[in-house]
């Protein structure tokens, strides 16, 4: 069973490396099967889609292989930011920014987003009180007045 899963994952990675567009069309996912990810993908994304529809501007902070399918789960305009330049391939190429979560106001104007999703950053890049404060300050600045921070 483990060998079959490894082989399946290797095929998905190869397909993605060859053609991210085709991998997206085929619905390829590299998901993490954890309770928090299921809650985010099922409950929170459904709520965001109900509230924002296709017109909402959503920023996802920290994009990688395991959440590469998120732009396909969000109805609104999906934006992503990640510090690692290699992770650009996992975001929407047109709306991805390579940059720091502690410098959001450097990349985005005030009152830009309906939703900012900053899930799983503490201890994985946001490691100090100063970084946490900068993240919150930036999120507050770029969120619309009635915006939602997750």
Regions found by a protein language model. Name each.
Residues 2-53:
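Class I SAM-dependent methyltransferase Rossmann-like catalytic core
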Residues 53, 125-126, 143-145:
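Helix-to-beta-strand junctions that scaffold the AdoMet/dcAdoMet cofactor pocket
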Residues 53-65:
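Conserved class I S-adenosyl-L-methionine
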Residues 62-76:
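Conserved SAM-binding loop of SAM-dependent methyltransferases across substrates and taxa
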Residues 88-105:
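S-adenosyl-L-methionine
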Residues 102-117:
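A short acidic, Gly/Pro-enriched loop at the edge of an enzyme's catalytic core
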Residues 114-129:
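A short SAM/SAH-binding and catalytic strip from SAM-dependent methyltransferases
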Residues 130-148:
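A short glycine-rich, Lys/Arg-flanked "PGG" loop and its adjoining helix->strand segment in the class I
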